[in-house]
């Protein structure tokens, strides 16, 4: 006789309905899982599974493969979730501050100093911390989603900023390509950096609101 267990596990890293849907889908695909549902507001996964076929550790591994995390330590799940949420919020704050410190000069240069010699190189250098530090998680999560043929908000941010940055990088390195066509090589570093900065602000506000909501639900 199969042993069906019903568990509720906190999920870390979800930001939208697509995230919740992707977590639900990946868990349901696991052998031994009878049913699974995600509550985005409370940030929890409710799952019915055959503990003889699949373990909580295997469910956690499956969820981590698409860029999220599952807290399976039932004895300390509440404390661990609160700790993880606080740590993530502080990290998000740092990344948001760094993004704006570099994005504002890039945007300012793009508006007022485009005729300044070597300005594209300055904008390139200032864009790097925004994309590769502040925006790093967008690209990692988008890649994890892509490997499982799914997508979420991170996919949109990663695609739009990558296209803007790579096109600008090409125009910075090979401006002659456009000059030979009789065209001016334009760059869009400010678009890539400002998108990341604004989305991070949104995530920060969302995380704060979500923390209050989930705390109220737990009470």
How would you describe each model-predicted region?
Residues 1-118, 153, 210:
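Flexible metal-binding regulatory segments at protein termini and peripheral loops
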Residues 91-219:
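Transmembrane helix-loop-helix hairpins at the membrane interface
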């Amino acid at each position: 006789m199969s042993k069906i267990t019903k568990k509720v596990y906190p999920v870390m890293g979800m930001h939208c309905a697509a995230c919740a849907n992707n977590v639900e889908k990946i868990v349901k695909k696991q052998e031994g899982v009878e049913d699974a549902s995600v509550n985005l507001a409370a940030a929890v996964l409710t799952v019915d599974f055959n503990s003889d076929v699949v373990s909580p550790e295997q469910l956690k591994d499956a969820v981590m493969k698409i860029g999220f995390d599952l807290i399976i330590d039932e004895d300390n799940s509440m404390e661990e979730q609160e700790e993880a949420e606080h740590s993530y919020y502080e990290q998000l704050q740092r990344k948001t501050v760094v993004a704006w410190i570099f994005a504002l000069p890039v945007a300012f240069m793009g508006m007022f100093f485009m005729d300044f010699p070597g300005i594209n190189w300055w904008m390139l250098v200032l864009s790097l911390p925004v994309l590769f530090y502040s925006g790093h998680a967008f690209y990692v999560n988008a890649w994890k989603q892509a490997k499982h043929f799914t997508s979420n908000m991170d996919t949109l941010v990663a695609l739009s900023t990558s296209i803007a940055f790579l096109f600008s990088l090409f125009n910075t390195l090979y401006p002659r390509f456009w000059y030979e066509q009789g065209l001016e090589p334009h760059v869009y570093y400010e678009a890539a950096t400002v998108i990341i900065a604004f989305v991070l602000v949104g995530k920060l506000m969302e995380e704060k609101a979500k923390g209050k909501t989930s705390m109220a639900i737990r009470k």
